[in-house]
From Swiss-Prot:
Disulfide bonds: none annotated. It comes from Mycoplasma mycoides subsp. mycoides SC (strain CCUG 32753 / NCTC 10114 / PG1). This is Cytidylate kinase. It is an enzyme of class 2 (transferase). It is found in: Cytoplasm. Signal peptide: none annotated. CDD domains: CMPK. One of its GO terms (cellular component) is cytoplasm. It catalyses: CMP + ATP = CDP + ADP; dCMP + ATP = dCDP + ADP. The keyword Heme does not apply. GO terms for biological process: pyrimidine nucleotide metabolic process. Its EC number is 2.7.4.25. Keywords: ATP-binding, Cytoplasm, Kinase, Nucleotide-binding, Transferase.
């Protein structure tokens, strides 16, 4: 059976990474969170002490940027950066980098090149609409916003991240949805041929089972 190229988009905090990492392990596919590519490049800019306000310097750094994934570990120029990508330093400046059209074009091409060999699950913004419009399976994962906020709040409590109340998280998600759906470049959209999954009242494992069964069905038709 031939493996597929799977593209996953959807609302923030709807469980995309958690669910599709599990799906990838079961199917022996390569999971790629495309958002981490932007974080990795941001880390590289900081590592090289580039002036974050100098777009020419940032663009030039693409020439030496080497990004690889191996056994769920992320490497930039052979440095394992997996545990460095959630730092506040990166999050504070990443928006100055992602708005540069040349950076975005580079990332889109790199992501498209990545899946020349099948057996990939790519998760991220505009994956189904812009990056992989011809993917074998396109999925849009959604969830009720109140349930998303509740899950995020409970995760934070479990991980002892106590900075935000449920109400603050809920309001943040409302703003995030609005920004994602209205941004000029690569807005969040539900494309007409995407498989829409609402996981508001499904467990992670239930969604995983549904997706794995669907992939097996499609693989058998190849």
């Amino acid at each position: 059976m031939e493996k597929l190229i799977i593209a996953v988009d959807g609302t923030s905090s709807s469980g995309k990474s958690v669910i599709f990492k599990k799906v990838a392990r079961i199917l022996n596919y390569q999971f790629v969170d495309t958002g981490l590519m932007y974080r990795a490049f941001t880390w590289y800019c900081l590592f090289k002490n580039i002036d974050i306000n100098n777009q020419d310097q940032i663009i030039k750094l693409l020439d030496s940027f080497d990004y690889k994934i191996s056994d769920e570990q992320i490497f930039v120029n052979n440095i394992n950066v997996t545990n460095k990508l959630i730092s506040s330093e990166i999050l504070n400046v990443i928006n100055k980098i992602t708005i540069i059209p040349q950076i975005r074009n580079y990332m889109v091409k790199a992501q498209q090149q990545m899946v020349k060999n099948k057996g990939y699950i790519l998760v991220g913004r505009d994956i189904t609409s812009v990056v992989l419009p011809n993917a074998d399976l396109k999925i849009y994962l959604d969830c009720d916003i109140e349930i998303r906020a509740k899950r995020r709040f409970e995760q934070n409590v479990e991980n002892k991240i106590l900075g935000k109340s449920f109400k603050q998280i809920y309001q943040d998600l409302i703003k995030r949805d609005q920004v994602d759906k209205t941004r000029k470049i690569g807005p969040l959209v539900l494309v007409s041929d995407a498989w829409y999954i609402d996981n508001s009242y499904l467990t992670i494992d239930q969604v995983v089972d549904i997706v794995v069964n669907k992939v097996h069905q499609l693989e058998s038709q190849k």
